A protein has these predicted regions:
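Intrinsically disordered, low-complexity segments enriched in small residues
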Residues: 1-95, 99-380
Length: 380
């Protein structure tokens, strides 16, 4: 019986014992659990002990696709990372778009479930269904751009997609992210820290064979509908037009817009700030297109640090690493975004952690004695 839209296979990897296995799932199971966060949650509830720490080797790190993920259409190049979060100690889910999600579906597996902890740093190479556990000692300590470039040189940049952690994940920062395509993050819930706790530097996917769908003509019609109508949707329009959704705080064509300032103690009128679309355009370099989607929503806005591939930006960083921490300098915010991509840090969690600490400092809850004599005022 042909399986339409899915591979029927779940890959399991035990890093402690250096073993792999494949579990075959029935069609009815997919009709219930589908994929993505629901699939990941199913395995977490079924197999992960409830009271273990997020950094316990028994904690599963799950990369999950879904039924139509990877097909040729808007919004379908997606995957989810599901694990026990070191931030909440509950089930955490991080969404990520981009080519890695398409390659995951094309790897021959619908999900990868990783348990255990490697004795030394490793990365996984999955090539047309074949899995090897490779030494990553020479990659450990490198930022995400350096690690990805080294893997691309080894296996061919045109043939692979990489998901890696940076120094934040290696050092178990609880809001560390996993970075794909140099700057597209699975950002939330500390998934990169769980990956680091397993001594897993990255996952390399090589080659892809996307499963057929039952009704390719119907899928084509749906894609054409979205492709035709997305430009007429204001949200999609902001995403597609330069400089992109990161500048969406500037709504001056529609209404007066404001940004939160100093951990939302005040607000700032955007059109009188340094965060206008015209200011962003001074640094705009281009866009990234996810497979099958014409919306080009990931923009590259380069502050001139010499690492153009690491300049991909999402909208949240404007709100968290800008006026929220008293930062009125757009270039400084853009530099912070690049550093988050390089180190593998969720800029949203980082920005709100900083603003909370700054307000705590100003309210006397944190002192200079706690900060090696440094001031932590907003804008410092």
């Amino acid at each position: 019986m042909r399986n339409y839209g899915f591979n029927s296979k779940i890959l399991r990897i035990d890093l402690t014992n250096k073993t792999t296995s494949v579990e075959t799932m029935e069609e009815n199971w997919y009709r219930i659990y589908g994929g993505g966060g629901l699939m990941g949650t199913y395995f977490m509830l079924k197999e992960t002990p409830a009271k273990i720490d997020a950094f316990d080797p028994q904690n599963a790190l799950i990369f999950a696709s879904s039924i139509i993920a990877g097909q040729d259409g808007p919004g379908l190049a997606m995957f989810r990372v599901v694990t026990k979060s070191p931030l909440s100690q509950g089930i955490g889910e991080a969404r990520c778009e981009g080519p890695w999600g398409q390659y995951l579906k094309g790897s021959g597996y619908d999900a990868i479930i990783i348990t255990g902890k490697a004795k030394d740093p490793v990365y996984l190479l999955i090539e047309q269904g074949e899995v090897t556990i490779e030494c990553a000692k020479e990659l450990w300590g490198k930022n995400t751009n350096e690690a990805t470039q080294q893997l691309e040189q080894r296996y061919g940049a045109e043939d692979i997609q990489c998901a890696v952690i940076g120094q934040a994940g290696e050092n178990l920062v609880r809001y560390a992210s996993i970075v794909t395509a140099h700057s597209i993050q699975a950002a939330r819930m500390g998934t990169g820290a769980v990956m680091g706790s397993k001594n897993l530097k990255g996952i390399v996917l090589k080659g892809k064979k996307i499963p057929q769908v039952f009704d390719p003509e119907g899928l084509r019609e749906v894609k054409e509908y979205f492709t035709k109508n997305m430009p007429n949707n204001e949200l999609s329009m902001w995403q597609k037009e330069a400089p992109g959704f990161s500048a969406s705080a500037d709504l001056s064509d529609y209404d007066t817009a404001y940004m939160g300032v100093d951990n939302f103690k005040a607000n700032l009128q955007v059109e009188t700030s340094n965060y206008t679309r015209s200011k962003y355009m001074e640094y705009y370099k281009g866009h990234h297109t996810c497979p099958g989607c014409d919306n080009d929503c990931i923009k590259y806005i380069d502050p001139g640090m010499g690492i153009p591939k690491a300049t991909g930006i999402h909208q949240e960083v404007t709100g968290t690493m800008g006026p929220n921490i008293g930062n009125t300098n757009l270039k400084t915010m853009l530099e912070a975004n690049v550093l988050c991509n390089l180190y593998g840090l969720d800029p949203t969690s980082l920005g709100f952690s900083i603003s909370f600490a700054m307000e705590s400092f100003e309210n006397g809850l944190i002192s200079k004695n706690d900060l090696d004599g440094k001031d932590l005022n907003f804008g410092n």
